[in-house]
């Protein structure tokens, strides 16, 4: 599904180069739920931005569904973002003047592709994420967790190949965070969604199939969940402590 090979990205201040990604290699299989963790400045968000085609990368290859990303004109990149990628951000990015249901449908409304299929998929997502009772309310009338579940539903309304999530629980309390992560799990198990999530939260990451740990622009370690989630959570905390002690 997603392949990243020898990815490099630097930023420049004046003539000084600051490497951020230093030869990153990874893959995400179809239907897999993968998290990326690491300390501030490790390259997590830059990696996500390269995969999402929002910033160019310097060297390497990124392919999604067999199609090479990068070195395209803006029209082609926008088409990939609109048709093959779904996005969930820390800030919910909902339109205050639209209802919850309308916010979920907005990607199809913009493209003029709502139709019966779009309405049926919206119904399915609304049921799946338990937001039937708020679908005709406005964002200001619902909780933060409900707004984020709405954002997850919106990200899936175009049946993307890959859902990208950047700190999706960063603005939520622990109960709402769990509800949102469980929404991702439901999307994966019920819809076959493929999810790539950047997070600083080991609890959220423990729901994933696999966690990639970045440090100083390189992959430090990868952990795969092989048993109970609580055990995986403890393993993640141990590795994060190990990373901190290596500084």
Residue ranges of predicted features:
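ABC family nucleotide-binding domain
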Residues: 2, 7-207, 214
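Conserved beta-strand-loop-alpha-helix hinge in the C-terminal portion
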Residues: 218-242
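Short acidic DE-rich linear segments
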Residues: 246-247
